[in-house]
Amino acid sequence: NRRLPEQQVVNGTPEFWSIGYLTDVILTRDPWMHRLDLARAIGRGPVLTADHDGVIVADVVNEWARRHRRPYRLELTGPAGGTWGSGTGGEQIAMDAADFCRVVSGRPGPDQGKPSGLLATQVPF
């Protein structure tokens, strides 16, 4: 799989992305996040489903967990939510699934403040 010529910096670490990662992952997540942004801008909540949005959220959670590599328990609420975890004794997080994705994308809402702990681990969108 060919890689892009320039490095991307994620969580302070430079990394190379493959063209496949860009087309299969980023070009799915980015428009999805814009959908959430537009819904927020017009004051309407997005209509999320487990079948579509839940798959994107699960993909984000799995990459987030691979990036931080620490024990955790995550409970995401809403139609796109679910429960994930790895290891024991780790941080426990409970929040809305769409808010989780906003936070780990580096675009928390004004009421969410600066992320800390495992939520400071960003995932590319």
Which stretches of residues belong to each language-model region?
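Structured surface interface patches that mediate subunit assembly and partner/cofactor docking
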Residues: 1-125
